[in-house]
């Protein structure tokens, strides 16, 4: 069994449980869409392989065993654009569960650190943003990271700069309070209630 096969063998049951549609057929039947667990599994595999959407689909056409474990045939694979659009529709709650599942693969301490980072939008997508009147230029990502394993425990994404980092840190800390003994942060997170 290859590493990819072991990986997909772990991902598919988790994706089925998280999306709640494990009983559905992965491939679209009678004009329907792909099952959510199949699309989530394909995205996890794309990230694991560190490839583009197009390359992931091309590789999977040559891997019938892997596509079979997802419940698809090579002929049933979605187009790269379908896979890309499906990624935008995955809810944050599904992403958080997948993040938590991946963090459990590490030996976690009870100590974490929190910090925020801003990401600029890619210049390649500027034309698309102007065409649809999408004005987001920066994305603020706040991450909670285990200090021993460097595993990301939680993430919060925001497109606006309103509110303080301390308010957001309090929300993330409450969500993970049962798992933490200490939380480290820089002085931008200085708040009495935190």
Predicted regions and their residues:
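Polybasic low-complexity intrinsically disordered regions
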Residues: 31-37, 48, 54, 58, ...
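DNA-recognition alpha helix
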Residues: 54-72
């Amino acid at each position: 069994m290859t590493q990819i096969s072991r990986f997909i063998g772990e991902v598919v049951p988790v994706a089925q449980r998280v999306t709640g549609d494990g009983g559905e057929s992965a491939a679209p039947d009678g004009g329907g869409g792909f099952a959510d667990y199949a699309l989530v599994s394909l995205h996890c595999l794309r990230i694991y392989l560190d490839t583009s959407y197009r390359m992931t689909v091309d590789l999977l056409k040559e891997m019938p065993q892997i596509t079979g474990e997802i419940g698809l045939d090579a002929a049933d694979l979605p187009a790269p654009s379908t896979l890309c659009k499906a990624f935008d529709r995955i809810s944050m709650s599904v992403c958080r569960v997948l993040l938590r599942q991946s963090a459990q693969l590490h030996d976690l301490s009870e100590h974490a650190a929190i910090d925020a980072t801003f990401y600029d939008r890619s210049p390649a997508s500027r034309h698309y943003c102007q065409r649809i009147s999408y004005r987001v230029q920066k994305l603020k990502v706040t991450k909670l990271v285990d200090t021993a394993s460097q595993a990301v425990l939680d993430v919060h994404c925001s497109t606006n700069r309103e509110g303080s980092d301390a308010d957001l840190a309090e929300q993330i800390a409450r969500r993970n309070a049962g798992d933490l003994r200490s939380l480290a942060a820089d002085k931008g997170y200085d708040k009495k209630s935190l």
